[in-house]
């Protein structure tokens, strides 16, 4: 196939890929396909590098595009079994001699020419040592200092990476798909990835709503926070739906995905899962698969509020009884889903520095003005937590409930400012004061 025709095929494939990914809710960055470079520009770059580009690279820059950039990433709710993202590019100005670290110049730093750098510093390189018109492409990992063959030629690399959805450019994207001859587009992993990606690009909600298995797959890819998706699940019995997600939890190997499966249970089964959630509080395989914070999330969502809250508070009390350090982040991860003022009353004797986590928990636990006043008049940690939490509430347009005693609040703000030692503590008070008129009205 003539090179110009081949490049036009690439351009069309990239445009369609980005269109499909954006339509399905993936995060995409503007596709860049710049006009070809002028011969004078190419020769100027060659002169600055001290080499002549291989013939194929010259042709691509001269007849195809002087700069290409393709970037996409899947939404955080997507349960992608491969955890890949898209990053492919080159530009005339990006061709540069690589630096592989170390005090002395490596001979490899004149063997390879970098044409693209991934977000983490990994590089895509062409190998000049072969002396061929269409040089091999390698990925270099900045952490491992290892080279991975991606294609025996530049055009072969672009063909194959395009077929794989322009994955890259951090080297871990390629590792499961690389073979002895570069990216293996026919291997089992590649076939599974291409099939998954094609379904992601084309499966619509309207199609998924007509078939249970497709609906399950759609929810895996997009989550089920959308009310349309939740409504579609109501046409099916809840037991098979719950079993689908429980089975996935049992089979999951990535701990970072466990919360996503729990969210699907909450969104598609909800309180009907209460018996299963209660079983998590018994010694059994489900609890061994899930962490205590994930169990707390399910408990808050699926059990009656009082029952669920008391279970989690009892667990937190056990942590305190064991004299383990209860930090704000841990308390927040277990209790913020309840949005209960009772949490504020529970946490009052337990809070300490650092305040991070505690302040977020206070803010989301529906405080009353009397709670805020009590904490502003409390110990130093309570005061700083209350100020930080109040600031977070003001930022989100919220305020405590009940009647505000502004005279007492202003007095306590004055005290807080006088007792503040760090600049950031004084700044907290200043931000509160600057917002008071808005709150009062």
Regions found by a protein language model. Give the residues of each.
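A surface-exposed partner-binding patch
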Residues: 1-122, 174-175, 191-202, 206-214, ...
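Short loop/turn hinge sites at secondary-structure boundaries
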Residues: 164-168, 336, 365
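Long, contiguous interaction/recruitment modules in multidomain scaffold/adaptor proteins
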Residues: 118, 127-205
């Amino acid at each position: 196939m003539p090179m110009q025709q081949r490049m036009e095929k690439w351009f069309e494939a990239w445009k369609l890929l980005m269109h499909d990914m954006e339509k399905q809710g993936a995060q995409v960055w503007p596709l860049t396909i710049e006009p070809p470079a002028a011969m004078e520009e190419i020769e100027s770059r060659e002169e600055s590098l001290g080499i002549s580009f291989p013939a194929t690279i010259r042709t691509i820059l001269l007849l195809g595009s002087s700069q290409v950039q393709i970037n996409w990433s899947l939404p955080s709710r997507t349960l992608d079994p491969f955890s890949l993202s898209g990053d492919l590019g080159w530009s005339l100005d990006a061709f540069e001699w690589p630096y592989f670290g170390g005090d002395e110049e490596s001979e490899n730093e004149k063997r390879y020419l970098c044409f693209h750098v991934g977000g983490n510093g990994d590089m895509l390189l062409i190998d000049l040592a072969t002396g061929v018109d269409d040089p091999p492409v390698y990925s270099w990992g900045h952490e491992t200092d290892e080279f991975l063959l991606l294609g025996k030629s530049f055009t072969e690399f672009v063909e194959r990476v395009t077929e794989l959805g322009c994955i890259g450019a951090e080297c871990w994207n390629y590792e499961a798909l690389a073979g002895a001859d570069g990216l293996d587009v026919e291997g089992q992993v590649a076939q599974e990835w291409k099939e998954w990606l094609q379904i992601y690009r084309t499966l619509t909600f309207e199609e998924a709503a007509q078939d249970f298995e497709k609906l399950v797959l759609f929810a895996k890819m997009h989550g089920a926070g959308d009310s349309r998706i939740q409504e579609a699940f109501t046409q099916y019995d809840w037991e098979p739906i719950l079993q689908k997600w429980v089975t996935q939890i049992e089979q999951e190997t990535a701990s970072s995905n466990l919360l996503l499966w729990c969210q699907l249970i909450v969104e598609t089964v909800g309180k009907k899962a209460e018996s299963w959630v209660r079983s998590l509080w018994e010694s059994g395989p489900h609890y061994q698969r899930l962490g205590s914070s994930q169990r707390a999330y399910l408990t808050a969502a699926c059990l009656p509020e009082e029952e669920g809250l008391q279970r989690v508070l009892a667990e937190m009390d056990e942590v305190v009884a064991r004299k383990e350090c209860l930090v704000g982040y841990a308390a927040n991860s277990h209790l913020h889903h309840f949005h209960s003022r009772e949490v504020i009353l529970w946490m009052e004797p337990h809070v300490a520095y650092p305040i991070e986590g505690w302040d977020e928990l206070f803010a989301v636990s529906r405080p009353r003005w009397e709670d805020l006043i009590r904490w502003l008049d409390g110990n130093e940690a309570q005061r700083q937590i209350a100020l930080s939490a109040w600031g977070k509430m003001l930022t989100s347009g919220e305020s405590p409930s009940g009647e505000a005693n502004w005279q007492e609040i202003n007095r306590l703000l004055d005290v807080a400012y006088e007792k503040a030692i760090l600049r950031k503590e004084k700044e907290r008070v200043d931000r509160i004061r600057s917002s008071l008129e808005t709150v009062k009205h």
